[in-house]
A protein has these predicted regions:
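Membrane-embedded alpha-helical segments of inner-membrane proteins
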Residues: 1-187
Length: 187
């Protein structure tokens, strides 16, 4: 006897929703790692890096190597985070069709999806990891250094040209103004 078609469709929907939710959780975790890494790595002082090298030679050296090219590292982190966040939005849109199917108005459905996905991305992909990383920068940097180093290698074909364009634009648009010294202000 064949299974009833309505049960088969329901199990496919449940299966799709489950994988969609799992995918969103994984991508939000990846976004948290990348966002936290940005804060943790760029808030390290030179002494923190040196202490990290002394404490854990391999992780400390990788942290130091990554920070030798800060613009490339920043480009890598921003590109990775954008790819991840786009993935979250696409997956959420995909499962949102099933979750919000009872809502007839496409405008209302779209508005709810945008508000929910924005909330999830901001809270779990940006704010919480950055707060944690700023309070535990050395620990967080050492925790994420290997995945970030892999990302840095994988995304080099994108981040290096981005860095070059950024430097070119900075040179064309003018140098950053320096701060005035106390002597200059007193004159």
């Amino acid at each position: 006897m064949d299974p009833e078609p309505s049960l088969e469709i329901a199990s496919q929907v449940d299966f799709t929703l489950a994988f969609g939710f799992i995918g969103i959780v994984i991508l939000l975790f990846c976004s948290a790692i990348v966002s936290g890494a940005e804060v943790a790595l760029f808030s390290l002082s030179q002494k923190d890096v040196e202490d990290s090298i002394q404490e854990n030679n391999s992780k400390g050296k990788i942290i130091s190597e990554l920070l030798e090219k800060p613009k490339k590292l920043l480009a890598t982190l921003l590109v990775a985070n954008n790819f991840i966040n786009i993935g979250v939005v696409i997956l959420f849109s995909f499962i949102g069709k099933n979750i919000f199917e009872a809502i007839d108005s496409p405008v209302l459905k779209f508005t709810i999806e945008v508000i929910l996905v924005t909330f999830l991305l901001l809270l779990f992909g940006e704010v919480l990891p950055k707060v944690y990383a700023s309070r535990n920068n050395i620990k967080f940097a050492q925790l994420v250094v290997y995945p970030i180093a892999v990302l840095d290698k994988i995304l080099s074909p994108i981040s290096i040209p981005m860095r070059e364009v950024t430097v070119f634009l900075q040179n064309k648009l003018g140098k950053q103004k320096t701060n005035f010294s106390i002597d200059q202000l007193s004159q």
